[in-house]
C-alpha cells in the first residue's frame, strides 16, 4: 500500500492511484502542469504504475490510446487545468468511436476560482460532451473517512464504466486547492494511525464483469441454415484474443457454409491457415458487374464494424439484403440502413451452444465454392501483376508486407490511402500479424503518437503512413526519449493527399493542388535528423524486404518510399477492373 500523508491533496491523490493499481491499472501518461501536481506526484511515486511524461497533450492522448488499444485495459491520462484538456479531444472522439478505454483526469481550480477570470481556468464540466461513457467531478479533497470512502468507490465505478458494458472514455474532473506541492501538513500525518487503511482497501480487485448476452446466436440459425446463399463479413475490429476471434468465425462459417469476407483491418487474413472459406478479394471482385450480379446473397452476417470497401457498401445498398450485425455496442453499425437485426453480444462471448442443437451444415456448397474459385483466380491475378511490377508504387507495399514481415508483428495502418490499399492487396497469410488503426472517426491526427503507444514495451512494430498524416503529428517524436521498444515507420511520401486523386475534385486543376492535395515539399531526412530519428531512403523492393525481417528491437526509424500519387491513382484506374477478370480460368 502506497499512501502519501504529507497533506490533504497528496493523500487524496494517492488513494486514487492506489485504488486504480489494485483494479489493474499499469500505465499513466502525464502532461506537465501546476494544478495537476498532486496527481502527478501520486502516479509518478507508485512503484507498480509505469508513468510516461509527454509534453504535448494531443500527442500524449493518442499515445495513451495506442497503449490501451494493445493492452485492452484502461490507461490513465493526466493534465492540468485550462486548455490542456481540450487538446485531448481528438483522441477522446477516436476512443469513443473505436471503443478504447481511457481514464482522463483533468485537474481544475476550486469552485471559488471559477467564473472570475482566474488564470488558466475554463469550464471543464462535461468537457467532452457525449463522447464519454461516464463523467464525474470529484469533490474537493477532504480527510473525512466518509469522503475518502466516496473517493475509493467513485474510482472503482470509473474503472468499471471504462470497460462495461462497452469500452470507452471516462472523464474525472479533479479540483484542488493550494498547496499543490507535497508540503507537509502535520495534522494529516496522524491519519496514518487513526484509520486502518489495510481494511480500507480490502476487496478491491480487477473487475471480472462480463457483458450480458441479451440474444443468442442459435435463435437465428434455423433461418440462416435455410438460406443457401449467405456471406459473413469480418469487419474492422481489434481483438484481445485473436485465436478465439478467428475460431469463432471459422466455426460459424463451417456450420453455415458461408464465405468469410475478411477486411484487412481484422486479424482474420493473418490467420489464414486452416480457414479455407476466407475471401480477401471482394472489393476487386465486385468491380466485375457480371460476378457482382451472380453472387448477390440472401443473408449477410456482419461481425464488428463495416469494412472500408466502397464497392461492398454500394453492392449491398443496391440489393438491400437481410442483414444481421453481431456486436456488443448499442450503436447502429449499419451505414447502409438495410433491414438489419442486431445480436448484441461479442463474437468472443458466444459459447456456441447451438452446435448441440442444430443440424449439420448445409450440403449445397455451390455458392461457397463459386466465391472460393473466383477468389483464388483474382489472387493469382494480383500476384502475377505485382510480381512483375518493379516500380515503387503504393499498391505493391501491402502485398510485400503481408509476405515478408516476421511473425506476430504489430502493424499500425494510417487512414486515407494506406487502409484502402491494405484492403485491396493485403494477402492471406499465416504470420499472425496484429493490425491496429484509428477507424473510429477515421481522422489522420495522432497517427504517429498512437503507433508509438501501440509499440511501447511491445514486440517490434510497424507503422504504414502517408506524408501528410505523419506531418500532422510530428510532435509524437518528442516521445522518443521515453520510448521503450521499436517502431519502423514506412513513409509513403507522395508529397500530398493521395486519396484526393481518387475523387472528382482532382479534375479541377485551378484549386486541386493548393487546397486538396496540399503538397508540403518536406525533406524528411532533415526532419528526422531534427528529432534524432534514423532515416533510410528506399530505392527498390529488395532493399525494403531486407530491412523488414527481422525488425530491430529498439529505437525508431523511418523507411521512406517516394512515390508519385498521380501515377498511383492512374495505376489503380488501369488495373482494378483487369484484376477482376476471371476468363473462366
UniProtKB/Swiss-Prot annotation:
Entry EC number(s): 2.2.1.9
Domain of life: Bacteria
Top EC class for this record: transferase
Cofactor note: Binds 1 thiamine pyrophosphate per subunit.
Biological-process GO terms, alphabetical: menaquinone biosynthetic process; phylloquinone biosynthetic process
Catalytic reaction annotation: isochorismate + 2-oxoglutarate + H(+) = 5-enolpyruvoyl-6-hydroxy-2-succinyl-cyclohex-3-ene-1-carboxylate + CO2
Keyword Transmembrane helix set for record: no
Names of required cofactors: Mg(2+); Mn(2+); thiamine diphosphate
Keywords, sorted A to Z: Magnesium, Manganese, Metal-binding, Thiamine pyrophosphate, Transferase
InterPro entries per UniProt: MenaQ_synth_MenD (IPR004433), MenD_middle (IPR032264), THDP-binding (IPR029061), Thiamin_PyroP_enz_TPP-bd_dom (IPR012001), TPP_enzyme_TPP-bd (IPR011766)
Pathway where it operates: Quinol/quinone metabolism; 1,4-dihydroxy-2-naphthoate biosynthesis; 1,4-dihydroxy-2-naphthoate from chorismate: step 2/7; Cofactor biosynthesis; phylloquinone biosynthesis
GO MF annotation: an example: 2-succinyl-5-enolpyruvyl-6-hydroxy-3-cyclohexene-1-carboxylic-acid synthase activity
Pfam families: TPP_enzyme_C, TPP_enzyme_M_2, TPP_enzyme_N
HAMAP family (alphabetical): MenD (MF_01659)
Similarity annotation: Belongs to the TPP enzyme family. MenD subfamily.
Subunit structure of this chain's protein: Homodimer.
Function: Catalyzes the thiamine diphosphate-dependent decarboxylation of 2-oxoglutarate and the subsequent addition of the resulting succinic semialdehyde-thiamine pyrophosphate anion to isochorismate to yield 2-succinyl-5-enolpyruvyl-6-hydroxy-3-cyclohexene-1-carboxylate (SEPHCHC).
Protein name as annotated: 2-succinyl-5-enolpyruvyl-6-hydroxy-3-cyclohexene-1-carboxylate synthase
Upper classification of the organism: Bacteria, Bacillati, Cyanobacteriota, Cyanophyceae, Oscillatoriophycideae
Amino acid at each position: 500500500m502506497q499512501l502519501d500523508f504529507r497533506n490533504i491533496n497528496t493523500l487524496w491523490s494517492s488513494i486514487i492511484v492506489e485504488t486504480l493499481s489494485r483494479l489493474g491499472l499499469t500505465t499513466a501518461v502525464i502532461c506537465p502542469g501546476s494544478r495537476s501536481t498532486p496527481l502527478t506526484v501520486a502516479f509518478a511515486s507508485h512503484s507498480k504504475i509505469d508513468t510516461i511524461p509527454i509534453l504535448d497533450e494531443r500527442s500524449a492522448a493518442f499515445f495513451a490510446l495506442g497503449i490501451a488499444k494493445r493492452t485492452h485495459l484502461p490507461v490513465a491520462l493526466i493534465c492540468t487545468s485550462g486548455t490542456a484538456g481540450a487538446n485531448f479531444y481528438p483522441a477522446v472522439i477516436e476512443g469513443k468511436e473505436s471503443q478504447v478505454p481511457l481514464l482522463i483526469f483533468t485537474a481544475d481550480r476550486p469552485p471559488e476560482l471559477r467564473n472570475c477570470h482566474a488564470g488558466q481556468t475554463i469550464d471543464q464540466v462535461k468537457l467532452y460532451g457525449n463522447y464519454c461513457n461516464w463523467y464525474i467531478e470529484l469533490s474537493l479533497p477532504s480527510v473525512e473517512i466518509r469522503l475518502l470512502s466516496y473517493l475509493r468507490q467513485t474510482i472503482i465505478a470509473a474503472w468499471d464504466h471504462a470497460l462495461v458494458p462497452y469500452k470507452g472514455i471516462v472523464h474525472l474532473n479533479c479540483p484542488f486547492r493550494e498547496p499543490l506541492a507535497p508540503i507537509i501538513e502535520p495534522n494529516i500525518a496522524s491519519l496514518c494511525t487513526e484509520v486502518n487503511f489495510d481494511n480500507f482497501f480490502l476487496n478491491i480487485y480487477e473487475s471480472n464483469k462480463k457483458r450480458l448476452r441479451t440474444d443468442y446466436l442459435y435463435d437465428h440459425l434455423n433461418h440462416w441454415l435455410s438460406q443457401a446463399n449467405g456471406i459473413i463479413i469480418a469487419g474492422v475490429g481489434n481483438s484481445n484474443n485473436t485465436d478465439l476471434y478467428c475460431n469463432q468465425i471459422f466455426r460459424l462459417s463451417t456450420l453455415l457454409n458461408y464465405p468469410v469476407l475478411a477486411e484487412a483491418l481484422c486479424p482474420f487474413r493473418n490467420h489464414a491457415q486452416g480457414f479455407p472459406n476466407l475471401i480477401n478479394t471482394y472489393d476487386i471482385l465486385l468491380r466485375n458487374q457480371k460476378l457482382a450480379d451472380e453472387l448477390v446473397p440472401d443473408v449477410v452476417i456482419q461481425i464488428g464494424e463495416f469494412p472500408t470497401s466502397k464497392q461492398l457498401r454500394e453492392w449491398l445498398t443496391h440489393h438491400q439484403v437481410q442483414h444481421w450485425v453481431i456486436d456488443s455496442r448499442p450503436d447502429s453499425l449499419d451505414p447502409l440502413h438495410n433491414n438489419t437485426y442486431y445480436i448484441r453480444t461479442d463474437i468472443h462471448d458466444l459459447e456456441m451452444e447451438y452446435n448441440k442443437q442444430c443440424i449439420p451444415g448445409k450440403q449445397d456448397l455451390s455458392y461457397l465454392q463459386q466465391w472460393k474459385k473466383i477468389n483464388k483466380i483474382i489472387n493469382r491475378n494480383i500476384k502475377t501483376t505485382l510480381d512483375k511490377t518493379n516500380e515503387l508504387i503504393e499498391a505493391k507495399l501491402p502485398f510485400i508486407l503481408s509476405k515478408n514481415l516476421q511473425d506476430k508483428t504489430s502493424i499500425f495502418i494510417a487512414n486515407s490511402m494506406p487502409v484502402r490499399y491494405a484492403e485491396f492487396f493485403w494477402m492471406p497469410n499465416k504470420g499472425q500479424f496484429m493490425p491496429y488503426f484509428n477507424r473510429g472517426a477515421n481522422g489522420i491526427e495522432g497517427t504517429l503518437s498512437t503507433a508509438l503507444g501501440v509499440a511501447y514495451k511491445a514486440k517490434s512494430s510497424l507503422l504504414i503512413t502517408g506524408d501528410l498524416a505523419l506531418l500532422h503529428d510530428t510532435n509524437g517524436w518528442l516521445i522518443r526519449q521515453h520510448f521503450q521498444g521499436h517502431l519502423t515507420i514506412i513513409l509513403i511520401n507522395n508529397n500530398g493527399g493521395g486519396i484526393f486523386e481518387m475523387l472528382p475534385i482532382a479534375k479541377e486543376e485551378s484549386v486541386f493542388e493548393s487546397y486538396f492535395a496540399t503538397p508540403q515539399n518536406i525533406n524528411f531526412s532533415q526532419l528526422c535528423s531534427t528529432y534524432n530519428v534514423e532515416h533510410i531512403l528506399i530505392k527498390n523492393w529488395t532493399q525494403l524486404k531486407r530491412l523488414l525481417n527481422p525488425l530491430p528491437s529498439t529505437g525508431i526509424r523511418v523507411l521512406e518510399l517516394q512515390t508519385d500519387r498521380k501515377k498511383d491513382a492512374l495505376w489503380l484506374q488501369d488495373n482494378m477492373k483487369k484484376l477482376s477478370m476471371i476468363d473462366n480460368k
